[in-house]
C-alpha cells in the first residue's frame, strides 16, 4: 500500500492493517504498549512478536514501539510466511516493512489537520527538498490528541485520553560517485490512559462497567538514530545499516481492575539497543544470467533496566496474603483465633529489579537460480542468540502470630539470582516460482511453492516475580511459626522465569493471475499453508488468585489455512477484497492438570475479511478536481479466548466509509468507522481469578484537510 491509499483509509498505525491483510489481526486494546499481533494462527500478547517490523531497513527490536504514528510512510509491504533466512529472529509468520518519504525522490511541503469524535485531533507538517550541493533534507512532526472513548464508572473520568508527538529528520547525500549516505533520526512521545477493562460474571453472563480506583497510565519516549551507507563497486553493492534505539517507558496499572484496594503495578523500562547489518549483492561479473545472490551479516545488543514494584494495599493483603496463610494454619495451632496471623502494614511494596541483556549475531545467504520460466531460491541463516537476567525481588513486613506473639516481628523475603540461555538456530528456506508470463497477450500468471523455517526468541517472565515472592513469603511466615506447607497455594516456581524459543516449519503453495490493462483489469492471488510448531509460547495465568502472568512453552501445534486477495478495476471504479481462514490447534498440550490437545489456539481469529469499493469522479475544473467515495467492511472471528475453548467471540463485521474532495490547493477528507455501532469484544484475560473483557471502539468520525505543495 502507498501513501495516498494509507491516508484515504485512515491507516495511521500498524493496528489498522488488521483484516486488510488476510489472516492478520492486531486488536486495539489496553494502550500503545499492548501491540499484540496474530498472523496465520500464531501470536503473542507478551514479549517477542511473530511479525517483524522494519522501518527503512532498520529492525524495531522492542514490541512496545510497534504502535507508532505512521508519519509520511511512502510504502507498506507485508511479507507473509517465515522470513527468518533474511530477517532472522521474530519473523516466524512474516515481516512488516515500512519505507518513509525520501527527500531525494520527493520535494515539497505536506500538511494535515484532522478533527473527529471524542475531541480527537491530529496535526502534522513536513517538508522535503535538496540543496545545490546535493544534500537532500526532509523532516516532519505530528501531534495527536483524544479525550478517549471509554469512561471509568468509579469517578466518571475518561479511561483512555491520549497525547502523542512524533518527529522524523532524514538527511541524504551522495558523498562520492560510489558512496551514498543516509541519516534518519526519529522520535516519539506518548502520554495516555487506557485499559478500559470490564469484569465478566460467568454465572450471570453479565459484563460490568469499567470501574477501578487507582491510576492506569502509560508514558513512552522512544528515539531511533539510523545511519545507512551504500558502496557501489564495479562488481558488487555493499550496504551498511546501523542503528541506536532508545526506549524509556512507564506503565502504571490498577492491576486488579476493580474498585477495591488490592494491588497496583508500576513498570519502568530504560532500554538501549544497537544493531548492525551488512548486505552484499553482486553486479556484473559477480553474477550470471542464471545465478544471482545476496549475503549478509547481522549483530545486535540490547540492555533493559527494568523496575516493576507491586504495591499491595489493604484488600490485597487481607485476601491474597493473609487469607491464603490463615486458611493453611491448622486449628490446633490457631489457638481459637479465626485470623491468627496479622500483618502490621496497611500497604507494602514487593520490589522487583531486573537487568536484562539480549545479544545475537547471524550470517545468511540466499541464492536465486533462473532456468527458463523457473526461479529457484535456496537460503540458509546461522543465528546465535544469548540472553541473561539479573533479578532481585524483595519485601519487608511486620507480622504477629496472635496465639504466641505479644508484638509484631519484622520479616524480610528476598529472591535474587541470575539466569541465562544461549541458542543456535539454522534457518533454511527453499522456494520455487514458475512465471507463465503473458496469457494471450492480455495477462500473466505465476505459481509458487515454499518450505521455510520460522523462529521466535525465548526470554524471561518478569511479571511473575510478584507471585513467586508471595509464595516464598507465605512459606517463610509459616516456617517461622513452625508450620510447613505441602502445597504453598500456587503452582508458580522459580523455574517459570525463563522460556525457550518457538520454532516452526511452514509449507505453502500459491499463485496469482492478472488480466486486462491498467484501467480495466482483474488481479487475483491465493495461497494455502501448513505450519507445524514446536515449543509453542503461550501466555498463561497461574491458577488461583494470582497477580501475574507468564509465558510458557506448552507443546506442539499446527495451523492450516488459505489466503485470498482480489482487485477489480473498471475505469474510475475499484473493488478489492481479502479473505483469510485459519484452523490453528494444539496437537500436544498437557499441563499436568488438563489436556488441551485438539483445542483451538486462543486469541487468533478463525477468519478475517475485508471488502472495499469506491468510485472517483474526475472533473475538468481546477478548483474542484475530483471526488472519491468509498465504502468498506471488515470482519474477524471466531476467536477463542482460553485454552479450554469455553469462551468464544463470534464472527463480527464492522462497516466504514470515506470520501475525499480534491480541490485546487487542499484535499478535504471525511471518514466514519463502525457505522452500525457494533458492540464487540477485542480482548480477554484473568486477574486474581476474575475474568475481564475490553470492548471495541464505538462509532466514530474524522474530517481532515490535506495540503500538498
Question: Which sequence ranges carry the predicted segments?
Answer:
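Transmembrane beta-barrel wall of Gram-negative outer-membrane proteins
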Residues: 108-110, 115-146, 150, 154-193, ...
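Short acidic/polar hinge/loop motifs at secondary-structure boundaries
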Residues: 56-80
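N-terminal periplasmic accessory domains that precede
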Residues: 15, 36-41, 54, 78, ...
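Solvent-exposed loop segments that connect transmembrane elements
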Residues: 151-157, 195-211, 256-263, 311-350, ...
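Membrane-embedded beta-barrel scaffold of Gram-negative outer-membrane proteins
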Residues: 228-233, 237-253, 448-450, 473-552, ...
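Gram-negative outer-membrane beta-barrel transporters
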Residues: 281-282, 286, 294-296, 300, ...
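Extracytoplasmic beta-strand/coil segments of soluble accessory domains associated
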Residues: 15-58
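C-terminal beta-signal and adjacent terminal beta-strands/loops
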Residues: 455, 633-642, 657-709
